[in-house]
Amino acid sequence: HVNSNLLFLGTEFGVFFSISGGNTWIKLSGGTPNIPFRDLAIQKRENDLVGATFGRGFYVLDDYTPLRQVTAKLLENETVLFPVRDARWYVPKRPLGCDKSGCKSSQGAAYFQAPNPPFGATFTYYLADQIRTRHEQRLKREKPLQEAGEDTPYPGWAELITEGLEDDPAIVLTVKNASDEIIRHIEGPVTAGFHRVAWDLRYPAPNPWVPKAKRQQSRSDPVGVLAEPGTYTVHLNRRIDGKLQELN
């Protein structure tokens, strides 16, 4: 209802969108199965897209406004960080002591529950290509040779050890306050495409870092205090070999 070139289409095989007035179509595959969508509706106030499947409920794409800015030229960029909608600052309700998505407490397994949109500020970004590890880069180089039936060069022990010791790459979104002080680092997916990551408007948890293998099971993860209302900025970085490189 704002950009006449942005169209949505419900089909027998999912939902598609077009940024060219219908000349080309792209599938919206995040979080939806490959099923028919019989009806679509736009919630204008929240800029949400609702799709009904008539048999498996309905799905909601929260705040599709980043799609209005998508153009063929924009997708030529290596990375894109879209503008962030103002977040609402409040303390989320915790029914029956639950503070995790999907927690049913004592309601029983038959109690139906669907996840709500994540609390806080939602960041949307685009990656043209996946950020690969050294091992993944080597496999990508070797694939054409394997398909051609040729031998692949042996990497050698030094390279294999380096691959084994390499930390996984990550997208890191850095939140700063009005004084340019770092408030939070949030990791996001490194695969190609559009991604969303939410900041819960909190500082990091004060608890010391513990490896996952030694963490005790609990109903809730430790959290920091809420950041005060104000103006914050977010910066997109990629982390390779433990070093951050700012992208936007």
Which residue stretches match the model-derived regions?
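Conserved aromatic beta-strand anchor motif in extracellular beta-sandwich/beta-rich domains
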Residues: 173-177, 236
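Surface-exposed coil/turn segments at beta-strand junctions on protein surfaces, enriched
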Residues: 116, 166, 190-192, 225-229
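Short consensus segments that form the blades of beta-propeller domains
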Residues: 7, 161-165, 222-226
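Short acidic/polar inter-strand loop motif in beta-rich domains
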Residues: 57, 205-209, 237-248
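Beta-propeller blade termini and top-face loops
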Residues: 1-111, 118-121, 128-130
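Glycine-centered tight-turn motifs at strand-turn-strand junctions
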Residues: 182-225
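Contiguous beta-strand segments within globular domains
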Residues: 94-170, 196-198
